[in-house]
Amino acid sequence: ASHTGKTVLAQKLLEKHKYPYLSIDHLKMGLIRSGYTKLTVKDDDKLTEYLWPIVREMIKTAIENRQNLIVEGCYIPFDWVNDFEKEYLDNIKYYCLVMSKKYIENNFDNIKKYANAVESRIDDEWCTMESVLDENTKFLKGAKKHNVNIVFIDDSYKVDIDL
């Protein structure tokens, strides 16, 4: 979900492990700004369909080349596992960051405050408590339905992933 700290976490993992990361948002904006797609930043579901085949093959290439790569972003389908054979899956760790309703309601000001911790968000007006609640509810349902690893942010923001 948006505003959960994915990019900050990827940056911390880069600094700790020296693994490069791919921000799917950067790929998205490059394709939109270059005119290679008519999709806009508001076309979330369509962007997932459009971006995922590219990202998926980048992941496969990194694994084939025995290279570490952190991929972060919202545009990964919950059924991503179906697109990889076992030899790839053995080399992939997936985590879905989701904030609880309680956390969002108690910390919304901080969520907005830290939105620019690693990236500059030019237009963040769409980010309301309601939109963050809705998006995190959607992501939690999707993650549970597909039985993926969830990093559930509930009482405090403590996200630490061991690679």
Regions found by a protein language model. Name each.
Residues 26-29, 76-77, 99-105, 157-158:
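Conserved nucleotide-binding/hydrolysis micro-motifs of P-loop NTPases
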